[in-house]
């Protein structure tokens, strides 16, 4: 600390002496500036600082320059590669498959082509589809079969070859707007001819309850009155088809069959036969021995109720009689006799043996109390 202090003091004294001498010579003080500049330039510290600054600038400039040069070389190489590389990326044509098929059919002399002919035209006309073949062939096939604007024509017997011909529907000529294949109007739908429509209406009316015009077969939103076609008036002799199976016949007692409302429709002989059958069944039930256990239907609701329930349990009216009850229409005597005769001709002993259980079997089934 003493050395630095003494040196600084001597410097200060030297500066004061020089300043005092210079005060007489140079009053303005212009001579100080060149002295300072010369001292700064002549000092080694100043040279070192300048060298460091220049070196830093050169280092800062050198990476950016090398990066720019590398980018320029990379771009030039890419451009050269693009020029030397062939153009394989082809653009897909802006036409739909329907438009392509229509082009192929219209350019043919006979206005009809097979599937292979349509694909050949598209491949020759558009290089994009030539490279992608046969990936789009199924799309052409689906468009031919799903669109009404294309009509399939069977191949003639004498014309050898494979596949059917396809042509355009005459009513679909204006499906493209102003003849431009880029703009297509709404989806074309083939109209049904009037003659075919009348035949369809006749078939629908002739099927009756199972027809498409029935309550469960007509299209949604159409009233049944909409199907009153003139064909029904032209052919009044075609009856509607009734149900294939008769309705289910519930079991009715013989007393129900012998009521006034129904007995007036049957002949006296049938009434006598039915009444005799019911009385025979009742007598068989009453004649059973009373050696039954205490728990029985007779003890709960009485013997009279059991006798009235027994015919209801074991007797079943014929189908024709029940249908007469349901429809309230008189039956012919011959049909009724032919239908009921086999049932009424069965002997009573067979009925009692087959349908009525014996007392011994009934006792064996119930536990003894």
From Swiss-Prot:
One example GO MF annotation: DNA-binding transcription factor activity
GO BP field: cartilage development involved in endochondral bone morphogenesis; enteric nervous system development; iridophore differentiation; lateral line nerve glial cell development; melanocyte differentiation; negative regulation of DNA-templated transcription; negative regulation of gene expression; negative regulation of neurogenesis
Residues of the DNA-binding region: 92-186
Region Disordered, annotated ranges: 1-89
Biased composition (Acidic residues): 21-33
Biased composition (Low complexity): 1-13
Keywords: Developmental protein, Differentiation, DNA-binding, Neurogenesis, Nucleus, Repressor, Transcription, Transcription regulation
Biased composition (Polar residues): 75-87
Domain of life (superkingdom): Eukaryota
Annotated Gene Ontology cellular component terms: nucleus
Subcellular location: Nucleus
The keyword Transcription belongs to this UniProt entry's keyword annotation: yes
A Pfam match: Forkhead
InterPro entries to which the protein is assigned, alphabetical: FH_FOXD3 (IPR047392), Fork_head_dom (IPR001766), FOX_domain-containing (IPR050211), TF_fork_head_CS_1 (IPR018122), TF_fork_head_CS_2 (IPR030456), WH-like_DNA-bd_sf (IPR036388), WH_DNA-bd_sf (IPR036390)
Stated role: Transcriptional repressor that is an essential upstream regulator of neural crest determination. Also acts in a negative auto-regulator loop by inhibiting the transcription of its own gene.
Protein name, UniProt field: Forkhead box protein D3
Annotated source species: Xenopus tropicalis (Western clawed frog)
